[in-house]
Each structure stands twice: as structure tokens, then as C-alpha cells.
Amino acid sequence: MKPIAELLNEQEQEITQEIKTEQSVVEAQTVENYSSSQVIELLKQSLNVHWQQTTSLTAQAVHLERWGYKKLAAVIREDAEEEHQHAMENIKRLEFFDTDYQPLTVSPPVWTRHDMLAMIRYNLDSVKQAAEVEKATIVAARMVGDELTANMMIPLLQGSENGIKLYESYLKLIEQMGLDNFLTLQV
């Protein structure tokens, strides 16, 4: 039978070895997982999409307010603020990776200012594009074991899916009641 001091010493050595093994696994994962160029590129794409949406939606809210559609302007302004938050989440994650995410590519909107249907369709298309990029980012991040990025993207994806529902419901309402009646409700 071994003395207690010797047993405690052996147990301490085993625990120390386990801790060292776990630390080396974590360090290896950190080096591998946080250098995925695919995840970083997808985050940049997501940032660009959300920044484009922020810019377009803010302009739309200003136009709608000026045209007297205060209810619709409030919804669009709220959506613009949400998209701005999504862009900020992407920036925070890209900053974590210490990567250059400039310049952002923001192109002019493709909707005509006074064409309400084109504006809503444009918003729907851009939200669908955001959802696609967010899904791809989640998949790519999980493939390399980057659960932090994947988990960060889930609320963004949920927000985009809510946006899809919103703009699809607007198009459905317009189809059912006509554009003039829809706009009358937005005053």
C-alpha cells in the first residue's frame, strides 16, 4: 500500500497532464478555427449586405416620412436600425479576427423613389440575400468549429427571416387590397 502523500502526488500529476492536454487542444482549435478565410469573407459579405440595407432603408424612411406615410416610415426606420445593429455585430466579429474589412461596397439602390412596389420588392430581395449569407456563414463557421460566429449569426438570420415575412406580407396585402388602399393605411 502506497503512502497518502505519494497517491496525492500521482493524482496531482495526472490532473496537471490532463489540463496541459486540454490547453493544447484549445490552443490548436483557436489557431485553426479563427483563421478560416471563408468565414471571414462571409462575415464581410454579411457586413456589406447589412450596410447596404441600412443605407437604403434610412433613405426610404426619409422619403416615406416626407410623402406622409408615417406608419410605413416608422416600420422602415425600425428595420434600418435593426440592420445597423446587424452591421455592427459583423464589425465586432471582424474586429475580433483583426482583419481589414474596408472598403465596404455600397451600391446605389435599384428602386425608383416613387415606385412603392419596387421599393418593397427591393427590400424583400435584399433581406433574402442577407439570409442566404447568414446561413452560409453559420454553416462555414460550424464546419471549422467556430461556434461563437455561428451563434452570433443566428439572431441576425432570425431578423432577416422576420424581414422576409414582413415584406412578403406587404406584397400580399397590396395584391389583395390594391396599392392605393395599402398606402391609405400607412398615413
Q: Which role fits each region the language model picked out?
A:
Residues M1-V187:
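Iron-associated oxidoreductase/ferritin-like identity signal
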